[in-house]
């Protein structure tokens, strides 16, 4: 009897540098690729039509790539703890290979599933692949987790990397008569404009990586914060989120001399740092890492939250960020920080509201990175910015969108506003508003808060929380 093993794809929708797939091929005579449309994730708190659509289209690409190598991707819908054991029984598989997950839900799911499979005589085997170094292997000298980025990066860089694996030429599937390529379930359309979402699938992701390494990475240190430079960042975040690209391969191919490559690699390390934090401190999904701010008194202002989410705050750089999010399912990282600071500090709304809003729309939405970024900006997380650092949206706009190109693209009401006024259009005279064909307070909102006053309110609230925690 030939040995049969399942290669269960999850957040690793690729064939290149896929340790779990390679291990499956080495361990069994017959390999059955599987993808589960997990009903728990599709309907969870952080569910996103944009992310689900991108995933579905990437699964379609994976199915085609597997078929070219002689294997048929099987697809099931349901809870993994129920459908995977049933599928293993149906196919006669004795092993299930997966890429190790680091998120709390994934870890719980895999523990439960391993027990259920074991009861049926099936072994579940996990391999690395989502990160260059696993979240639990980068530790201090005394074996503790890091809570500060810089020493984490030094320890991360000191670890030896495994070799990058080639994609398999052939995958030994079942006999021809037993092959079955399942239809891919339909999902709701994305809420973002499809034309603004990067092409899904591993092949397109590899093209993006090649283009970035050829044209952009060397200048990254200078361009990464420029909101008006669409080619200033890699736009690989959704590819990392769904494992269309291996982070190890990205780092290996980006290695080299130059500040741009060093800074770019540092962003990959930030992703791994936040996964490390979530692995060791899963409570951060429900509460601030900095316990001193657990009692921070936040505002209850649904109207302000809606204005922020809709890009109607009256601060053009904030509104451009939020409109980019809704229109494209993506936001430039600098714009994410500006919008997050405005919600958490100017509006003094709980950062978890913003965290959830981002996850509803981001095609690249990653639980660890999104939580880490929000807590960093809100000054409640690991290695955060100081609580008294509050972004001034006008100054941020002038610095990172000096000519207003980013604002004009996403806030077209302000397209004719002169550069000197683009980041504070409320200062225009009536005649200037007429010339710019925009009436502040009618066509475009006046600021919903006064930044200097909001800053003082936030400082007082954070200081009071620290005193109360002592």
Residue locations for each model-derived region?
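Alpha-helical packing segments of well-folded alpha/beta enzyme cores
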Residues: 20, 58, 62, 205-212, ...
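Trp/Phe/Arg-rich N-terminal binding region typifying the photolyase-homology
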Residues: 1-164, 260, 460-465, 469
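Glycine/tryptophan-enriched, flexible segments
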Residues: 122, 143-293, 400-401, 405-470
């Amino acid at each position: 009897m030939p040995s049969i093993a399942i290669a269960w794809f999850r957040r690793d929708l690729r064939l290149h540098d896929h340790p779990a797939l390679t291990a499956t091929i080495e361990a069994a005579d017959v390999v059955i690729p599987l993808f589960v449309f997990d009903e728990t994730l599709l309907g969870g708190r952080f569910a996103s039509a944009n992310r689900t659509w991108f995933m579905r289209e990437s699964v379609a690409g994976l199915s085609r790539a597997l078929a070219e190598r002689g294997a048929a991707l099987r697809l099931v819908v349901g809870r993994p703890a129920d459908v995977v054991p049933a599928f293993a029984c149906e196919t006669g598989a004795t092993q299930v290979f997966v890429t190790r997950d680091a998120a709390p839900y994934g870890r719980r799911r895999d523990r439960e599933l391993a027990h259920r499979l074991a009861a049926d005589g099936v072994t579940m085997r996990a391999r690395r692949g989502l990160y260059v170094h696993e979240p639990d292997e980068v530790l201090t000298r005394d074996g503790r987790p890091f809570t500060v980025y810089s020493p984490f990066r030094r320890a991360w860089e000191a670890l030896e990397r495994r070799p990058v694996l080639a994609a398999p030429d052939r995958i030994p599937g079942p006999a021809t008569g037993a092959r079955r390529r399942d239809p891919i379930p339909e999902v709701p359309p994305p809420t973002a404009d499809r034309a603004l979402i990067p092409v899904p699938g591993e092949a397109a992701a590899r093209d993006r990586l090649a283009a970035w390494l050829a044209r952009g990475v060397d200048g990254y240190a200078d361009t990464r914060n420029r909101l008006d430079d669409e080619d200033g960042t890699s736009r690989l975040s959704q590819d990392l989120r769904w494992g269309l690209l291996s982070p190890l391969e990205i780092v290996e191919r980006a290695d080299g001399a130059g500040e741009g490559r060093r800074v770019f690699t540092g962003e990959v390390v930030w992703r791994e740092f936040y996964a490390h934090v979530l692995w060791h401190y899963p409570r951060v999904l429900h509460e601030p890492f900095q316990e001193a701010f657990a009692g921070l008194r936040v505002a209850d202002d649904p109207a302000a939250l809606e204005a922020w989410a809709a890009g109607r705050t009256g601060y053009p750089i904030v509104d451009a960020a939020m409109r980019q999010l809704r229109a494209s399912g993506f936001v430039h990282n600098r714009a994410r920080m500006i919008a997050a600071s405005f919600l958490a500090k100017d509006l003094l709304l709980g950062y978890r509201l913003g965290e959830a809003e981002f996850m509803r729309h981001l095609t690249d939405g990653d639980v660890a990175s999104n939580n880490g970024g929000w807590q960093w900006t809100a000054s409640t997380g690991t290695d955060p910015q100081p609580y008294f650092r509050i972004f001034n949206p006008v100054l941020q706009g002038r610095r990172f969108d000096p000519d207003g190109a980013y604002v004009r693209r996403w806030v077209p009401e302000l397209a004719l506003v002169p550069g000197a006024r683009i980041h504070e259009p409320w200062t225009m005279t009536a005649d200037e508003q007429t010339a710019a064909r925009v009436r502040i307070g009618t066509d475009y909102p006046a600021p919903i808060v006064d930044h200097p006053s909001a800053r003082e309110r936030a400082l007082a609230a954070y200081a009071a929380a620290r005193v109360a925690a002592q």
